[in-house]
Curated annotation (Swiss-Prot):
Belongs to the UPF0346 family. This is UPF0346 protein EF_1680. NCBIfam families: PRK13672.1. Transmembrane segments: none annotated. It holds the Pfam family YozE_SAM_like. It comes from the Bacteria. InterPro entries: UPF0346, YozE_SAM-like, YozE_SAM-like_sf.
Length: 72
């Protein structure tokens, strides 16, 4: 069974101060984050419209690629 992007993202939470960890920490606080989806477009649209904590969509794109590689 494939895990959702959110589940993958939660593995990156922690005290480190880098863009990926910051994204994971902030997404964990976002009660409306689409937690069950594996759909790039649904996540991308949500983040563009609702996630003021994500300063750059390139961060999401890079993590999406890592998610796909780790979720085969």
């Amino acid at each position: 069974m494939r895990r959702s992007f959110y589940h993958y993202l939660m593995t990156l939470k922690g005290p480190a101060k880098d863009s990926e960890t910051d994204f994971a920490n902030e997404a964990a606080k976002d009660i409306q984050f689409p937690k069950q989806t594996e759909d790039y477009h649904e996540l991308s649209s949500y983040l563009e419209m609702n996630a003021d904590y994500l300063s750059n969509m390139d961060i999401f794109d890079e993590l999406w690629e890592k998610y796909l590689e780790n979720n085969k």
